[in-house]
Amino acid sequence: VIQDMMRRSNVFYIQGNHDDMFLTVIRHLAVEITSETIQNISTDMLMAYQNWIANGGESTIQQFLQLSQPEQRDILDYLEDASYYEMLENKHCLYILVHAGIEHFSPEKELDTYQPVDFLWYRPDYEKRYFPSERIFLVTGHTPTPLIREDRKPLIYRGNGHIAIDCGCVFGGMLAAYCIETGKTYYVHSKQNPLSEKKIDEQK
C-alpha cells in the first residue's frame, strides 16, 4: 500500500502513531548489532519494540525485510518526510486533517508550533467544538467511530466541527472514505469478523 501511495502524485500522506512506532524501531533494527551498539539498546527501546510487535509490527517487519535495500530506503525516506497535518479549503470551509487529534490544543495556537507527538496519539473530545468558527472542521482517524457514535455503528461521525473517519476496519468494522468536495461517504466491509460490542469496549 505504501509503495502504491508513493507512486501517486495526488496522495498526501499524514503520519500516524503506527508509522511513528515503525520508524522508532526500524532505525535501531537497521544498525548492525555489535558489542558496542548493543550497549545503546535501552529499556525504553525494548518496550517500544514490544509495543510495536503487539500492534501488528511482526507482519510489517516480515514484509519490509523482503524488499530490496533501495526499496526499504525509499519507504523510510517517504515516511520520515510525511507531514503531521494537512489543511484543505473547499467552499469557504477549512479542513484540518490529522491522524489522531491535537493534544494541548488552543484555538489561538498555530499548528506548526505543536510537537509531532501532539498529533499522533491523542483522542479528541468529540462532544466539544475545538474551533469557534463553524467553517473549520477537524478531520481525524485513530479513534474508532463506534466509540464516538451513540448508535455505536462503524460509520463516519460528523458533529461539533469533527469528521471522524476511522470506522474500525481492523476490528471488523468498515474501511471508510470521506469526500470533502461533496460530503459523500464511501465504505468497504472488513474481512474480519463483524464488529462486536466486546471489541468496541476493548478499544476504550
Language model segments and positions:
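A short, highly charged, low-complexity intrinsically disordered segment
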Residues: K191-K204
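Extended hydrophobic/Leu-rich segments
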Residues: I2, I38, Y114-Q115, K204
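Core catalytic region of metal-dependent phosphoesterases/phosphodiesterases
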Residues: V1-D44
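Acidic, His/Gly-enriched loop-helix segments that form or flank divalent-metal centers
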Residues: D44, N51-A164, G168-M174, I180, ...
